[in-house]
Curated annotation (Swiss-Prot):
This is Zinc finger protein ZPR1. The gene is ZPR1. It comes from Homo sapiens. Expressed in fibroblast; weakly expressed in fibroblast of spinal muscular atrophy (SMA) patients. One of its GO terms (biological process) is DNA endoreduplication. Keywords: Cell projection, Cytoplasm, Deafness, Differentiation, Dwarfism, Hypotrichosis, Metal-binding, mRNA processing, mRNA splicing, Nucleus, Repeat, Zinc, Zinc-finger. Acts as a signaling molecule that communicates proliferative growth signals from the cytoplasm to the nucleus. It is involved in the positive regulation of cell cycle progression. Plays a role for the localization and accumulation of the survival motor neuron protein SMN1 in sub-nuclear bodies, including gems and Cajal bodies. Induces neuron differentiation and stimulates axonal growth and formation of growth cone in spinal cord motor neurons. Plays a role in the splicing of cellular pre-mRNAs. May be involved in H(2)O(2)-induced neuronal cell death. One of its GO terms (cellular component) is nucleolus. Residues 1-18 have a biased composition (Low complexity). Its main location: nucleus. InterPro entries: Znf_ZPR1, ZPR1, ZPR1_A/B_dom, ZPR1_jr_dom, ZPR1_Znf1/2.
Length: 459
């Protein structure tokens, strides 16, 4: 069969058909494709490599993929047909994040054992109820489940047990007793807590209830200590020479980065912008020439406000979708009518309209590969489809809803279309932050006044 658009040759003497129009350029190949069981083009790369067990040649398979609601990783699998040795590990394909991350999961049912887990080399795993810890850099990274983490720990403890028993080592019996306790955890005989602490910020624990909030999972972002920076191989930058003062408010600065969609080199534009009736912010926009992906992010240009801000807007018609909106990285979003909550740091900082943010939220939910194909859960798929339909109704103005922005740092903003008068459909509240909120912002240990007294000699 001839290819589409080609001209088949006719009999001798026939008129020559006009040449076909040039074919459109092929779509750019993405280095990291979303993980999916139905993507036939997503095939691993096979590389012949040396087996470190028998020193014959084995096969390494590399898969560049993308974890939903997370980022890019490289899955590596080695197998040797000569000695049967095999090994699987993962590596983060992205940079070390600006902050470390700590996942605290309360395991209460067998369903929690099936949560997807990305554990990097630098992540430490703890189970406080058993006083059990797997230190950082003691295991290779893995793409597994909660049950897989425990099974891997059991295998590690059982590895040298025959030698301990042969030597009549007293620790062998205690390790056997501990292994029994770990096996009981796999049956969830009683609730327990799993903590994954990764200073690099590249580990991940799945939220099976997405886009709803997961009450069993607490995600904490924190600033790394100097010891953790050294452990990750990060060196402190030398102080730069003080440049001459420049007015950058009217200039657009550029710096090189990688596209978050296809990981190709791209340019990011950055500019300082004054928002009316608010403050200065830094807007960064990236346009990828390889795949056409566009994104923008907003960073606060000022300090943390003395009080947190909670903005509640009653959406009554489609005209509310045109309101300008600034969502900082520390701002969470809630829509009570949809039982939906978007946590801090998700989607990053954004300067857009209300419609733009709602569409970003809908896209975040509907593009989750775990809700598509044969790997999807029918009940979860129906919930997400219903969520998407209700979100469309809100955007079109056919459904009234409340839109709540809660920013402990006080650096978020929603346009008041009646300014300088009060907006009858919008309520702005200022509140005092809790201890936990100050802890997440890194304010509890920050001393900005009277710190000289601590350096003065004792009299």
């Amino acid at each position: 069969m001839a290819a589409s658009g080609a001209v088949e040759p006719g009999p001798p003497g026939a008129a020559v058909a006009p040449s076909p129009a040039p074919a459109p350029p092929p779509a750019p190949d993405h280095l990291f494709r979303p993980i999916s069981a139905e993507d036939e083009e997503q095939q691993p790369t096979e590389i012949e490599s040396l087996c470190m067990n028998c020193y014959c040649n084995g096969m390494t398979r590399l898969l560049l993929t993308k974890i939903p609601f997370f980022r890019e990783i490289i899955v590596s699998s080695f197998s040797c047909e000569h000695c049967g040795w095999n090994n699987t590990e993962i590596q983060s394909a992205g940079r070390i994040q600006d902050q470390g991350v700590r996942y605290t999961l309360s395991v209460r049912a067998l369903e929690d054992m099936n949560r997807e887990v990305v554990k990097t080399d630098s992540a430490a795993t703890r189970i406080p109820e058993l006083d059990f810890e797997i230190p950082a850099f003691s295991q290779k990274g893995a793409l597994t489940t909660v049950e897989g983490l425990i099974t891997r720990a059991i295998s590690g403890l059982e590895q040298d047990q025959p030698a301990r028993r042969a030597n009549k080592d007293a620790t062998a019996e205690r390790i056997d007793e501990f292994i029994v306790k770990l096996k009981e955890l796999k049956q969830v005989a009683s609730p327990f807590t799993l903590i994954i602490d990764d200073p690099s910020g590249n580990s991940f624990v799945e939220n099976p209830h997405a886009p709803q909030k997961d009450d069993a999972l607490v995600i904490t972002h924190y600033n790394r200590t100097r010891q953790q920076e050294e452990m990750l191989g990060l060196q402190e930058e030398a102080p730069a020479e003080k440049p001459e003062e420049e007015d950058l408010r009217n200039e657009v600065l550029q710096f090189s980065t990688n596209c978050p969609e296809c990981n190709a080199p791209a340019q990011t534009n950055m500019k300082l912008v004054q928002i009316p009736h608010f403050k200065e912010v830094i807007i960064m926009a990236t346009n990828c020439e390889n795949c056409g992906h566009r994104t923008n992010e907003v960073k606060s240009g000022g300090a943390v406000e003395p009080l947190g801000t909670r903005i509640t807007l009653h959406i009554t018609d489609a005209s509310d979708m045109t309101r300008d909106l600034l969502k900082s990285e520390t701002c969470s979003v809630e829509i009570p009518e949809l039982e939906f909550e978007l946590g801090m740091a998700v989607l990053g900082g954004k300067f857009t309209t209300l419609e733009g943010l709602l569409k970003d939220i809908r896209e975040l939910v509907t593009k989750n590969p775990f809700t598509l194909g044969d790997s999807s859960n029918p009940g979860q798929t129906e919930r997400l489809q219903e969520f998407s339909q209700k979100m469309d109704q809100i955007i079109e103005g056919n459904m009234k809803a409340h839109f709540i922005m809660d920013d402990p740092a006080g650096n978020s903003y929603l346009q008041n279309v009646y300014a300088p008068e009060d907006d009858p459909e919008m309520k702005v509240e200022r509140y005092k932050r809790t201890f936990d909120q100050n802890e997440e912002l890194g304010l509890n240990d920050m001393k900005t006044e009277g710190y000289e007294a601590g350096l003065a000699p004792q009299r």
